[in-house]
Amino acid sequence: MVATFPIQPNIKNEVLDSKLGSRILKYAYGFEAPVKQVFGGIANDSLTFLTIGPKTDEKVNLGFQTDKISVDEASETVMFNLVNKERVSRGGKALVLDNKLRDIAREHSADMMKRGYFSHYSPEGKTVADRVMGAGIDFLVIGENLAYAPSAELAQQGFMNSPGHKANILSTDYNKVGIGAMDGGVYGKMFTQAFSN
């Protein structure tokens, strides 16, 4: 029998920070991907990773709200490098880091933590396209990946195990990315990847 259930963010952090726990977490994640293939969205909230499909209007109530957040530049850098490593290893071109897209991604990650939701849509119904247009950025194509995870590495691993998120990361339609990582302390980390041409 396999079961998955929500884990409080402070417990996730404690497990990730321990030497034994972090090793177990990596192995546990290896079991999650096959379970998600069998059970679909039922297993989208677990010890290691929470996400929703890149083109869905699904909304998840996080069960908390916090203003005690800070930009996690180190995680943004790690994730940016991991994204480009995946692209280049498959013969693709590296994405350029775009500061305007990064600011939009940071704002969305912060908004989700402050207002306790997890979605590509703000509570007012605004999408990544709306947010980018509102910032005066021109684009032909736009995409977004979201993850709530204890680390950039686990978030990126989760993206690469999800066909829709992986497609965004590897798409030749995009040449720019902005990554916004917000650290909510005991509440964990929120990641937004905003892709554009």
What are these regions (language model features)?
Residues 102-152, 169:
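Short, surface-exposed glycine/acidic/tryptophan-bearing loops
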Residues 142, 175-177, 189-191:
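Envelope-exposed proteins and targeting segments
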